[in-house]
Amino acid sequence: ANAAQYKLGATNAKCFDVKNACNAFITSLEIANAYIASGNVETVLITSGEIMHNYIKWDYNDKDEICETNATLGFGDGGGAILLQASEDENVGMSTRFQTNGNYWDVGVIWGGGSMYMADPDKFTMKNVDPDMVQKNTMRAAKFYFDSMKKNDIDIDDVDLYITTQMGKYKIHQLADTLKIPHEKIVVQCDRFGNTAAASMPIALTRALESGELSLGSGQRVVMFGAANGLTFGYASFVL
């Protein structure tokens, strides 16, 4: 964050990094919204970038090893940014919600790079998560998202675009089917850019704005569904 501030010449801006795996962007939205609501700041810039190819395992010794780590083959690099500003329009507010399931804190973790496993190359990749655990928590996540929308009095049909963590096309469509969301209303871009983790959401939002699918000041509603290692579910809803 300090480097971004320096390169932008934003010398008066307070800045800090936010880390929450694939949910870092939604976490940043929540923090930015709280800052703006407090009246302490009027404008917040959120930047999100990922270099995920560093964690892809390229060398395999046997078929079993491929089956253990092939989820990393879908990783991709990318970055995006969003600028938030205070508004007097009561119809353009933001709501966010999180659920942390700390009993899964060690699932889907890349252990290498820290002080514990600095020089162990086998720790610089991520092992696949147990399919039964994934299925169980996909259903839990869907319930969390549904409850979050209900809490905000938002119906499925009220939303113009859904943006999710890009864990895979099959999983995204499975979530859409569970919540009865039309496939054309939910973003799938992992087939083009891979899973860019926390950068997925700002990339998707930017592409939708550039294509004309969304436009600022239109009153369109966007809902974001996040899922991150740890295990955390995140939700954000806002009107453009």
What are these regions (language model features)?
Residues 35-76:
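Flexible, glycine-rich active-site loops centered on histidine and acidic residues
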Residues 60-135, 143, 236-240:
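Condensing-enzyme catalytic core mediating Claisen C-C bond formation in acyl metabolism
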Residues 10-14, 38-44, 69-70, 78-79, ...:
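Short coil/turn connectors at secondary-structure junctions
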Residues 53, 90, 102, 171, ...:
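Flexible, glycine-rich phosphate/dinucleotide-binding loops
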Residues 1, 6, 11, 18-37, ...:
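Claisen-condensing/thiolase-fold acyl-transfer catalytic domains that form or cleave C-C bonds
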Residues 25-27, 52-57, 102-105:
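Short, well-ordered, mixed-charge alpha-helical segments that flank or form enzyme active sites
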Residues 152-156:
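Conserved short secondary-structure transition element at the edge of the structured enzyme core
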Residues 19, 43-50, 75, 84, ...:
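Short beta-strand segments
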